[in-house]
């Protein structure tokens, strides 16, 4: 029965055989494509370049085109596009001309969720980790969920998987307001912060109203799981007319964490729930922000009847998500080693949470930080916040802003950030021009016992493996043996 479920297209889309993804290598697209492949659909897709993601999809049977051309979409029954793709794309133009439906990725995700028990995780920060934790705990409880995540689960080696149960767990993306397509049975809001404000015409009240609208997509018998520690979530809560469970460190939260203790990568805490005995748990991730992500998971797992034993097991064996405080290894330096960490954080709130986690888990160590701002608009809008939070590193190297398709904005660049941080008088940042080899710059700055954090959402994601493979550090490793 399970095999038939995986092999046959779902009845709600029985007229659709071939699905074409424009930008199939994107993190939001590839997971949906993989699930559809496993459901038996013919999947094709185009992207600007080959990548491990496109190679993986090709190995599953997807037809991959490099470059965007009209003929790529000619045989498709439907096109799936991200918000970054517009009607000038030749594949989209062809589809519109031939009256082939063109749908946003979130609408396709909504179709996958339509006849399943959908769990959607929204919020400015923590979506990927929380979604991944829920999938891990559900798997430990024997529920075998389908999941679509915005990052690669280290244990599964993928960001999507077709399960055999009725559960579908997915991220709900507020960046383009596309999460309004989703109609889950359970919805999480981890927090609400000022980001992607162009989508909301620079109006924070509009952003808040959109989150309320998202929660009202729940049926009257659904469940909203929200973080009471977040002041904006607390503010909108009276407007939410759906059953609600709150979580956090706050004393008035329904589900609370107490007795938090961090030892390096390991975080221990006790969970208090209504009408339940206290539950002692641990997660292999540092920081209070990951305690909150775990609490959201515990709320949902408890509501769905997952046993406490499975909750404890699923959290404790969780191996993390790619680029979320991912420890790449140890870099050899004179007198010892440096712990090399890669992280996706690109908003001041995320940067602050990671720095706090480092200080909590390794209080005696220096933090050497290589940071790459993501988008000129974000750098401009949150400039003062970036200055304040980045100044908390012991050593700071600032790469030039990753544009993500944006044109430069005067005064919103890394050189200006360096100057502003320097003027505070507590740190002298080093500006790194685009394309510079960082290994010979970083190595003299490192001391045994340091933590080297590479952080940002742009191409800095390739820096940690490059440093690990650098002949400079390989030579040092040879000397230390």
From Swiss-Prot:
ATP binds at residues 123-129. It catalyses: UDP-N-acetyl-alpha-D-muramate + L-alanine + ATP = UDP-N-acetyl-alpha-D-muramoyl-L-alanine + ADP + phosphate + H(+). Pfam families: Mur_ligase, Mur_ligase_C, Mur_ligase_M. Its EC number is 6.3.2.8. It comes from the Bacteria. Cell wall formation. Belongs to the MurCDEF family. The gene is murC. GO terms for cellular component: cytoplasm. This is UDP-N-acetylmuramate--L-alanine ligase. InterPro entries: Mur-like_cat_sf (IPR036565), Mur_ligase_C (IPR004101), Mur_ligase_C_dom_sf (IPR036615), Mur_ligase_cen (IPR013221), Mur_ligase_N (IPR000713), MurCDEF_pg_biosynth (IPR050061), UDP-N-AcMur_Ala_ligase_MurC (IPR005758). GO terms for molecular function: ATP binding; UDP-N-acetylmuramate-L-alanine ligase activity. Keywords: ATP-binding, Cell cycle, Cell division, Cell shape, Cell wall biogenesis/degradation, Cytoplasm, Ligase, Nucleotide-binding, Peptidoglycan synthesis. GO terms for biological process: cell division; cell wall organization; peptidoglycan biosynthetic process; regulation of cell shape. PANTHER family: UDP-N-ACETYLMURAMATE--L-ALANINE LIGASE, UDP-N-ACETYLMURAMATE--L-ALANINE LIGASE-RELATED. The keyword Nucleotide-binding applies. It is found in: Cytoplasm. Its main location: cytoplasm. Pathway: Cell wall biogenesis; peptidoglycan biosynthesis. Gene3D superfamilies: Mur ligase, C-terminal domain, Mur-like, catalytic domain, NAD(P)-binding Rossmann-like Domain. The keyword Electron transport does not apply.
């Amino acid at each position: 029965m399970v095999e038939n479920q995986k092999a046959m297209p779902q009845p709600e889309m029985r007229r659709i055989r071939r699905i074409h993804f424009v930008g199939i290598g994107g993190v939001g697209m590839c997971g949906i494509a993989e699930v559809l492949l496993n459901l038996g659909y013919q999947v094709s897709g185009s992207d600007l370049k080959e990548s491990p993601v496109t190679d993986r999809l090709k190995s599953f049977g997807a037809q991959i085109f490099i470059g965007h051309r009209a003929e790529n979409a000619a045989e498709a029954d439907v096109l799936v596009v991200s918000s970054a793709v517009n009607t000038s794309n030749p594949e989209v133009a062809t589809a519109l001309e031939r009256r082939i439906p063109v749908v946003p990725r979130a609408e396709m995700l909504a179709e996958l969720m339509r006849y399943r028990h959908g769990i959607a995780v929204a919020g400015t920060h923590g979506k990927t980790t929380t979604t991944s934790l829920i999938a891990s705990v559900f798997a430990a409880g024997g529920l075998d969920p389908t999941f679509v995540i915005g990052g690669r689960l280290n244990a599964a080696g993928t960001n999507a998987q077709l399960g055999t149960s009725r559960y579908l767990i997915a991220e709900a993306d507020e960046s383009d307001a596309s999460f309004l397509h989703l109609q889950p049975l359970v919805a999480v809001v981890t927090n609400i912060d000022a980001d992607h404000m162009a989508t909301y015409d620079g109006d924070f009240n509009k952003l808040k109203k959109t989150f309320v609208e998202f929660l009202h997509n729940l049926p009257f018998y659904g469940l909203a799981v929200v973080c009471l520690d977040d002041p904006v979530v607390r503010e909108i809560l009276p407007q939410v007319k759906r059953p609600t469970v709150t979580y956090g460190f706050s004393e008035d939260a329904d589900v609370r964490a107490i007795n938090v203790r961090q030892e390096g990568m390991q975080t221990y805490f006790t969970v208090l729930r209504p009408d339940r005995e206290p539950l002692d748990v641990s997660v292999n991730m540092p920081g209070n922000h990951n305690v909150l992500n775990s609490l959201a998971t515990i709320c949902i797992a408890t509501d769905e009847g997952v046993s406490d034993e499975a909750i404890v097991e699923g959290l404790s064996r969780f191996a993390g998500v790619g680029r979320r405080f991912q420890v790449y290894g140890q870099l050899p330096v004179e007198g010892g080693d440096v712990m090399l960490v890669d992280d996706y954080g690109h908003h001041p709130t995320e940067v602050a949470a990671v720095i706090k986690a480092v200080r909590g888990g390794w209080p005696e160590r220096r933090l050497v930080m290589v940071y790459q701002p993501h988008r000129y608009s974000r750098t401009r809008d949150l400039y003062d916040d970036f200055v304040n939070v980045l100044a908390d590193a012991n050593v700071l190297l600032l790469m030039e802003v990753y544009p993500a398709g944006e044109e430069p904005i005067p005064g919103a660049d890394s050189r200006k950030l360096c100057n502003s941080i320097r003027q505070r008088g507590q740190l002298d940042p080093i500006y790194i021009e685009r394309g510079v080899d960082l290994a010979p710059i970083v190595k003299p700055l490192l001391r045994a016992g340091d933590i080297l954090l590479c952080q940002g959402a742009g191409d800095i994601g390739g820096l940690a493996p490059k440093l690990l493979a650098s002949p400079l550090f390989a030579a040092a490793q040879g000397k230390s043996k």
